Amino acid sequence: TTQFARTRATAQPTVTALGLMPTVVPATSPSHIQDVVTEIRKHPGKTVLVVGHSNTVPAIVEALGAKRPGAICDSRYDNMFVVIMAGDGKASVVHSTYGEASPRDTTCAAMR
């Protein structure tokens, strides 16, 4: 997660249910994307929850070796990307949604 309240609140139900201690990776760091990837790679073979922002998640997915998703609207809070890291180093991504659907924002170019 990042230091911001929205990402922490999104992660909180999972953190509480599984008794986890979240790792905070500052979103304001110039090396944020690589810092997140480094943290993920510390847990090979494990499931890692990354709660991020519309302007960083696509780059994180790509940095993990999967196809970069399209732009995400700032007003969309229901996107979920599952990156599957294969043993051979290849990665793939599945895009889904969760929870209550975000209202359709017709002003967002990414949704047109």
Give the residues covered by each predicted segment.
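Ligand-binding grooves and catalytic loops that recognize ribose/phosphate and carbohydrate rings
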Residues: 58-64, 85-98
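Short, surface-exposed, polar/charged, turn-prone segments marking secondary-structure boundaries
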Residues: 26-28, 52-53, 76-80, 110-112
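Conserved histidine-centered catalytic loops in small-molecule metabolism enzymes
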Residues: 1-23, 89-112
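Domain-level recognition of soluble alpha/beta enzyme cores
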Residues: 69-89
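Phosphate-coordination/substrate-recognition cap region in phosphate-metabolizing enzymes
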Residues: 1-72
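Low-complexity, compositionally biased segments
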Residues: 38, 81-82, 103, 108
